[in-house]
Amino acid sequence: MKKQLRSSFSTQGRRMAGARALWAANGMKKEQLGKPIIAIVNSFTQFVPGHVHLHEIGQLVKKEIEKLGCFAAEFNTIAIDDGIAMGHDGMLYSLPSRDIIADSVEYMVNAHKADAMVCISNCDKITPGMLMAAMRLNIPTVFVSGGPMEAGELDGQHLDLIDAMIKSADESVSDEEVSKIENRACPTCGCCSGMFTANSMNCLNEAIGLALPGNGTIVATHANRTQLFKDAAKLIVENTYKYYRDGDESVLPRSIATREAFLNAMTLDIAMGGSTNTVLHLLAIAHEAEANFKMDDIDMLSRKSPCLCKVAPNTQKYHIQDVNRAGGIMGIMGQLAKAGLIDTSVVRIDGMTLGEAIDKYDITSPNVCEEAIKKYKSAAAGKFNLVLGSQDVYYKELDTDRAEGCIRDIEHAYSKDGGLAVLKGNIAQDGCVVKTAGVDESIWKFTGPAKVFDSQEAACNGILGGKVVSGDVVVITHEGPKGGPGMQEMLYPTSYIKSRHLGKECALITDGRFSGGTSGLSIGHISPEAAAGGNIGKIKDGDIIEINIPERTINVRLTDEELAARPMTPVTRERYVPKSLKAYASMVSSADKGAVRLID
């Protein structure tokens, strides 16, 4: 059944003369009146290398849409660079910005009654924020990311942002060497080159079904990234007419992002050792979609999904550009499908089922198309470059080695245990998360005395000051969604542990979270958090912490009676919390529920 255009409320009828006059002042031509209005939700900013190249691409998408007869209007969202906001109180704003982005998209699209939208996202909180908005609005939507940064190179070795952070804190590394690394770590526009949060989310968007193949892995500088934007423009027009003219609801975000799609996305995340932040974001997006996807589902999937792909920071051998050469996300999904670990019947924005898309785009499929071959041969150029789509270098050959290549088959998995795990115990009754793909198997079982800090800053000072020694478990409390507030990323503490050469000799646990760039025995999202009365807030220096990844447990060696009788450890830090973050803290849920705002 034909649907009424939402935009007709501002373009049709005598009483809308004023609105039509304003639309005309926005550039709408008379022949475009009554045609679908498609919002272009851009996230261009000159604060973030993952977004610095998006200035003109929104207008390219607008031109492509308007060639096909619709009217397109662009607006921007905020975007925070977690790497620049890291290590100071700017990080308190990062996770809350996800909800601000979701709200701003909802406000703009509903206020102006747009009929559909193209979301141009890229970095950490922007993609999930836009996805949350898409679930709320439930209008035809296509996502296309700005693409990953090329990996840096020094002395024939790949490097990235995390190398710069670790080496700069290592006193044995000279200033000259640090300068060399700093100047080569981030050579192009795009989101940082490892399987960090931004790239993880852009890859998962392919699995959810709201982005086209190649969205997560074709580098930002390649011409085929520009082609993705053109393809997205064409597709959003097709899907807009499918919904409003033909009444086809299969193109709507909630029809695509079902429980099964979230299970597929999480299975992919586990298989590729993605960022632990994706757990927060998938839970939050599913909450907005009203899909029945919970922390227990993640625990269940982590016990049966193997690790099929290892990328920085879990290894320095491969970066996202190498995943693309190995067939991208469809390459990983193809191996998961062969093992029966994903539901291939789910639908996608391109009208195919996931199974049909795998058959067409998995480079090991006998039916792989030429378009797929071209996408996945898209290579890094190896030059400093801040311009989207400005190079067309191609690999001579694809990486189809599923035994020893970047992407493995089930038989040759990096580990039978997946790349992420949910642990529970008496200091995490509602769960916590560890990226097992980044943990050396020699410390999957770890027991040690606690060194407790009530802030990230105190932990950094303690680690660099020599208070943390081999065998310790660093415990950082009151950094959860409420306690921070804002649930800071603990990338600097984990980097400093590595800079002290303790990466395989210490653990770190927190009710805060970690950057996608974190590796090592780093356990976050402990729920309930200290600020909500969680037992992590009762741990004292010297308490023995027991971590067992194979058994999925984490405990402090105290009886239930001892824990119940012990008071919360007083918070000694001094931290100014502005009203905006106090408002966030008053509404936010625990990490095991995605740190969503709880609003009746």
From Swiss-Prot:
Single GO MF descriptor: dihydroxy-acid dehydratase activity
Keyword Iron listed: yes
Catalytic class of the enzyme: lyase
Pathway recorded for this protein: Amino-acid biosynthesis; L-isoleucine biosynthesis; L-isoleucine from 2-oxobutanoate: step 3/4; Amino-acid biosynthesis; L-valine biosynthesis; L-valine from pyruvate: step 3/4
One annotated Gene Ontology cellular component of this protein: cytosol
One Pfam family of this chain: ILV_EDD_C
The keyword Metal-binding is assigned to this record: yes
Annotated active site: 515 (proton acceptor)
Gene Ontology biological process terms in this record: isoleucine biosynthetic process; L-valine biosynthetic process
Residues annotated to bind [2Fe-2S] cluster: 123, 192
N6-carboxylysine carried by residues: 125
Cystine residue pairs: none
Binding note for cofactor: Binds 1 [2Fe-2S] cluster per subunit. This cluster acts as a Lewis acid cofactor.
Keywords of the record: 2Fe-2S, Amino-acid biosynthesis, Branched-chain amino acid biosynthesis, Iron, Iron-sulfur, Lyase, Magnesium, Metal-binding
Function: Functions in the biosynthesis of branched-chain amino acids. Catalyzes the dehydration of (2R,3R)-2,3-dihydroxy-3-methylpentanoate (2,3-dihydroxy-3-methylvalerate) into 2-oxo-3-methylpentanoate (2-oxo-3-methylvalerate) and of (2R)-2,3-dihydroxy-3-methylbutanoate (2,3-dihydroxyisovalerate) into 2-oxo-3-methylbutanoate (2-oxoisovalerate), the penultimate precursor to L-isoleucine and L-valine, respectively.
Quaternary context: Homodimer.
HAMAP family xref list: IlvD
Family membership noted in the UniProt record: Belongs to the IlvD/Edd family.
Protein name listed in UniProt: Dihydroxy-acid dehydratase
Organism: Bacteroides fragilis (strain ATCC 25285 / DSM 2151 / CCUG 4856 / JCM 11019 / LMG 10263 / NCTC 9343 / Onslow / VPI 2553 / EN-2)
